[in-house]
Design a protein with these regions (language model features):
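Short beta-strand-plus-loop segments that form exposed binding edges in beta-rich domains
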Residues: 646-654
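Flavin (FAD/FMN)-binding glycine-rich loop and adjacent Rossmann-like elements that form
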Residues: 163-169, 173-529
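Extracellular carbohydrate recognition and processing domains
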Residues: 613-639
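Beta1/beta-strand and adjacent pyrophosphate-binding region of the FAD-binding site
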Residues: 33-43
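Conserved N-terminal/central alpha/beta ligand/cofactor-binding core
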Residues: 58-59, 64-146, 150, 188, ...
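N-terminal secretory signal peptides and thylakoid transit peptides that target proteins
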Residues: 2-17
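Short, surface-exposed beta-strand/strand-loop-strand elements in extracellular ectodomains
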Residues: 599-614
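A short beta-strand element within beta-rich, extracytoplasmic domains
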Residues: 577, 583-598
Length: 666
C-alpha cells in the first residue's frame, strides 16, 4: 500500500526501512536509537503498544524483522475471532470502531459502532492512521543480532544491519517470541501433558472435528502397509493427554473473490500433485467438500480458512518453526505457500477431479486489489502458536473455564479453546488427524498481569503480551488478535508506569496499573459492573466469613466466579456463611443472591439481610432459579461494611449453596 509523502517519510537505513510519522528523521536515523520503549514486532499488538506509549507522552519505536505491518489483522484474517465482543476495550475496541468508521465514512467516536469483519487494506489504513496520529516510527527488516543485558535488564538490542536500539523498557510483540528467547526468559513450545496443570484437553487429542469421515488409506500403495506410509503420517498415536513437541498447523488466510478481475490460483514452482494424494483418495471415497471457508468480509471478498480433514492447514509442516533461524523460517514460509497454492491449483485444475469441484474452486480467485506487492497472496503466515513464556502465572484451561480467576487482570479473553490439528496418524489401518480441539467456555475471563511479564529475576524490563505464559490449550483461546491488542496496551501502560516509578515490571503496583487501565477504557472484569453495583463472590479474598465447614465445587454449572460452596448437607445450624460487601455510598440497594440448582438442594434456605433498618429474613428455594440473580428485596444501607447477607443451614432439607451476592444502587 502506498504511503503518501505528505503524511510520512520513508527512509532506507542499511537494509532497514523506516517510516517516520511526524518525528524528525535525524532523531531516528542514527546508528543508535534511544527511546522510552522499544517494541519488537509490527503485529497488531506491536502497533497498539507503541501507540499507547505515545499517548502516555513517551517515545516509542516498532522494529519489525519482516516487511509486513499489522500481522494477521492486515494479513487476511478479516473475520475477527472475537468471542464476547463487549469485553474488547481500550485501543482494541477503538480499532474496530475505526474499521466501522472507515466503511461508513464517518468520524470515529467512543460510541461509534464496532465492525469485526473487514478487508485487509482497510485494516492497514486504520493502523496507518493510528501510527501517524501518534507519531510512531516503524523500522522494517530489523532482524535481531544480539540482545545485551546488564544484570536482569535489557540495555540494548542490535540488528543484523548494525543498528542499535536502547530503552529503559522493551516489549516482544512478535508471534515467535525471539526477543524473549534472546533475553534469557523461560519458555516452552509444543503441548503439555494434561497432568502438568491438571487439565483435560491438553496434549495429544484424537477427536472428531476436521476429521476424515470416510475411509482413506495412509499407505503409498492404498491398502498395502508393506509399501510404507505417505509423507507426513505417523505410524502410531500416543494416548490422549500425552505431552509432545508438536504445534498446531499454520496456513494463510486467503482473501478471495468471485469478481471478474480476480487472480486465478497460481500453479506454484515445485508443484507436485502427489502432495494431495490423501485428498484425492478422500474425494474418491465420496467426499465432495467443503475444502475451505468463504466467510464474507465486505467488498465481495472473503477471509478463507481451513475447513475439513484436508484443507489449507499444512499439518506437520511447522514443527521446527518456533526456534528456527530467520532464513529457515523464510524457507518454511515458502513451503507453506507452495503447499497451499498447490492445493488451490489442484482443486481448480486437476483433470481427475469431478467437474463440479473444479468449477466451484475456479469460480474463486485472489482479490487483485489486496496484497498487490505479493500477487494477491497474503504476506503473513498464520503462526497460530510458537514459543510460549513460562512465568509466575501460567494461564491454563482452569482460567478459561473460570474455575480459577486471576487476581491481577489486565484484559479479558473469551474465545473457544481452539487448537487446529497437529499431526496425521494411522488408526486401525486408516489415516486420522490428531490435535483439533474446539471446546467452548462459559464467557469472558481475565488474563493475569503475571502472565505477560517474566518471572521476577529473569528479565525486569521486558513484557511479552503475545507469546505470553499459557498452556497450549489455554493459548488456543487467548491467541486472538483483539486479545493481543488488549494485552499489548496493558503491557505498554505497565512499562511506562514502571519507568516513571523507577521499579521493575514485577514490582509495579497493580492497583496503580489497574486504575490507569480502567481510565484508558480497558475492561478488567466480566460481566462489566453497572454503576453503583457491587458483587461479592464466595472466592473473594475478603468480605466472606464462614462458620463450620464449607466445600468448594464446580459440578453444577451456572455459578459466578471460579466455583461455589456447599454445606455438604451436614452440620445443620452450625454451617453458616456471611457476605459482607464494602458499599461505596449510603442509600437504597436491591440485594440479589445467586446459587446453582439441583434436586438435591434445600428448598428452604433462610437468608438474613442485615441493613440499616435491622434484619430481614427471606427463604429461598435452591432447587430452582439456579444460575441467575434472584432478588431478595430492596433495603437501605450505610456506606462501608455495616450491611451483610447471611446464609444459614438450620432445618434445611438439602444441600445449601453459597455462590455470590450482588448489590445494585437505586
Amino acid at each position: 500500500m502506498a504511503h503518501p509523502l505528505s503524511r510520512r517519510h520513508v527512509l532506507s537505513l542499511g537494509g532497514a526501512t523506516l517510516i517516520l510519522t511526524g518525528i524528525p528523521a535525524a532523531s531516528y536515523a542514527a546508528a543508535v536509537v534511544e527511546v522510552d520503549l522499544v517494541v519488537y514486532g509490527a503485529t497488531s499488538a506491536g502497533i497498539v503498544a507503541a501507540v499507547q506509549a505515545r499517548r502516555m507522552g513517551r517515545t516509542a519505536v516498532v522494529i519489525e524483522p519482516g516487511t509486513h505491518l499489522g500481522g494477521l489483522s492486515t494479513g487476511g484474517l478479516g473475520m475477527t475471532d472475537s468471542g464476547v465482543k463487549e469485553s474488547i476495550g481500550g485501543i482494541a475496541g477503538e480499532f474496530y470502531r475505526r474499521i466501522h468508521a472507515k466503511y461508513a465514512g464517518t468520524p470515529v467516536t467512543p460510541t461509534s459502532p464496532a465492525r469485526f469483519t473487514f478487508e485487509p487494506h482497510v485494516a492497514r489504513a486504520v493502523f496507518d492512521d493510528l501510527l501517524s496520529a501518534a507519531g510512531v516510527p516503524v523500522y522494517y527488516s530489523i532482524r535481531l543480532s544480539t540482545v545485551t543485558r546488564a544484570g536482569s535488564r535489557i540495555t540494548e538490542v542490535a540488528a543484523d544491519n548494525g543498528q542499535v536500539f536502547r530503552a529503559p523498557m522493551f516489549m516482544d510483540c512478535s508471534y515467535e517470541g525471539d526477543l524473549m528467547d534472546r533475553a534469557g526468559v523461560a519458555w516452552t513450545s509444543g503441548r503439555e501433558a494434561n497432568s502438568a496443570y491438571g487439565e483435560t484437553i491438553n496434549g495429544v487429542q484424537l477427536r472428531d472435528k476436521h476429521q476424515f469421515t470416510l475411509p482413506v488409506s495412509p499407505y503409498r500403495t492404498a491398502g498395502d502397509p508393506a509399501s510404507g506410509l505417505l509423507p507426513g503420517i505417523a505410524a502410531t498415536v500416543a494416548p490422549n493427554g500425552t505431552a509432545d513437541t508438536r504445534i498446531q498447523a499454520y496456513n494463510f488466510r486467503m482473501c478471495l473473490t468471485q469478481a471478474a478481475g480476480r487472480i486465478p490460483f497460481p500453479r506454484p514452482a515445485g508443484y507436485d500433485a502427489a502432495d494431495y494424494e490423501l485428498l484425492w483418495r478422500y474425494i474418491q471415497a465420496g467426499y465432495t467438500g467443503p475444502f475451505f471457508t468463504t466467510h464474507s468480509v465486505g467488498g465481495g471478498k472473503t477471509d478463507s480458512n481451513n475447513n475439513g480433514a484436508f484443507s489449507t492447514d499444512h499439518i506437520g509442516g511447522n514443527y521446527s518453526y518456533p526456534t528456527a533461524s530467520y532464513a529457515a523460517r523464510d524457507a518454511i514460509f515458502a513451503e507453506h505457500r507452495r503447499y497451499q497454492q498447490g492445493l488451490m491449483w489442484f482443486l481448480a485444475n486437476d483433470s481427475r477431479l469431478p467437474a463440479a469441484i473444479r468449477s466451484a474452486t475456479a469460480s474463486w480467485g485472489l482479490a487483485a486489489d489486496e496484497f498487490t506487492t505479493t500477487g494477491g497472496w497474503p504476506p503473513q503466515l498464520y503462526v497460530r502458536e510458537a514459543r510460549r513464556m513460562v512465568s509466575a502465572y501460567v494461564m491454563t484451561e482452569h482460567d478459561c473455564r473460570r474455575n480459577v480467576t486471576a487476581a491481577d487482570p489486565v484484559g479479558m479473553a473469551s474465545y473457544t479453546m481452539d487448537s487446529h490439528n497437529c499431526q496425521r496418524v494411522v488408526v486401525d489401518g486408516l489415516v486420522k488427524n490428531e490435535g483439533d480441539v474446539q471446546i467452548g467456555i462459559p464467557g469472558a475471563y481475565p488474563i493475569s498481569y503475571r502472565s505477560i511479564v517474566p518471572s521476577s529475576g529473569q528479565c525486569t524490563n521486558l513484557a511479552v503480551p503475545v507469546c505470553l505464559s499459557a498452556s497450549h490449550i489455554a493459548y488456543g483461546s487467548i491467541r486472538m488478535e483483539p486479545v493481543f491488542m488488549i494485552l499489548a496496551q496493558s503491557a505498554a501502560t505497565a512499562a511506562i508506569l514502571a519507568t516513571d516509578a523507577a521499579v521493575s515490571l514485577q514490582q509495579l503496583s497493580y492497583p496503580a496499573l489497574a486504575a490507569r487501565l480502567r481510565a484508558d477504557g480497558q475492561i478488567l472484569q466480566w460481566p462489566i459492573p453497572t454503576p453503583g453495583e457491587v458483587i461479592l463472590d464466595n472466592a473473594a479474598s475478603s468480605g466472606v466469613t464462614r462458620a463450620g465447614t464449607w466445600l468448594s465445587s464446580t459440578s453444577i454449572s451456572g455459578f459466578y466466579g471460579p466455583d461455589y460452596e456447599h454445606d455438604n448437607n451436614t452440620a445443620k445450624g452450625v454451617n453458616r456463611l456471611r457476605f459482607t460487601p464494602a458499599l461505596p455510598a449510603a442509600g437504597a440497594y436491591t440485594v440479589y443472591l445467586r446459587w446453582t440448582s439441583h434436586t438435591n438442594r434445600a428448598s428452604n434456605v433462610p437468608v438474613d439481610v442485615v441493613h440499616s433498618g435491622g434484619i430481614t429474613t427471606r427463604t429461598v428455594d435452591q432447587r430452582v432459579s439456579g444460575g441467575q440473580w434472584v432478588s431478595l428485596g430492596s433495603y437501605s444501607f450505610s456506606a462501608g461494611s455495616a450491611g451483610s447477607v447471611l446464609l444459614r443451614t438450620e432445618n434445611t432439607n438439602g444441600y445449601v449453596i453459597a455462590d455470590a451476592v450482588r448489590f445494585v444502587a437505586g
